[in-house]
Amino acid sequence: GEAVDVGRWRGDLATTDLLTLALQPSVMWLGPEPTFAIANDQARQHMRVSNVANGFTTSLNGSGVIVAVADSGLDADHGDFGARVLSNTDVVGDGSTADRHSGHGTHVACTVLGDGSRGGYAGVAPQAELIFQAMENDNNGQFLSPSLNYILNQAYSQGARIHTNSWGSSQVSDQG
């Protein structure tokens, strides 16, 4: 196994060893790691962007706000971010924050705070600053899950008071 973060381990276990491990006093929870999935092709429809854009006008633009996004990875050179990427951190241990396999992390970050300079569509907070937490293993494209406590605390300590997580699983999981 490998240490994921404080108090969490990930690894394979033989079925015959499951009861032995479950009976250890320090073990609070055992379960399968959920398989996460992402979908880039449904955002405008699910977010009802057209309804919001046509419904009201506001002067809010995200100025002075730090937003954290935990997702696959980030194309940090994408023109919509400028110098507003405060940090781009690998939270799964593969040493990379790139968005090699899906583009989902960049898509989500642009939806939140893209300024529209790269394609004409601005995000909902185009002047906000970004803390990005990369959750995709670039070696195999697997989307991994650090503990929510870890990623939320890391982002909070860097000034983020908004954290968005646009991923999930069809499997039931209590991440402990």
What are these model-derived regions, one by one?
Residues 1-56:
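Autoinhibitory propeptides
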Residues 11, 144-145:
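A conditional alpha-helix N-cap/helix-loop micro-motif detector
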Residues 14, 117, 147-148:
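Amphipathic coiled-coil/heptad-repeat helices and related helical stalk/stem segments
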Residues 18, 105, 145-149:
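Amphipathic alpha-helical segments in well-structured domains
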Residues 18-19, 120, 152:
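Short glycine-/small-residue-rich flexible loop motifs, especially phosphate/cofactor-binding loops
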Residues 23-24, 53-89, 94-144, 157-162, ...:
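Subtilisin-like serine protease catalytic core
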Residues 149-158:
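Short, well-structured alpha-helical segments in soluble
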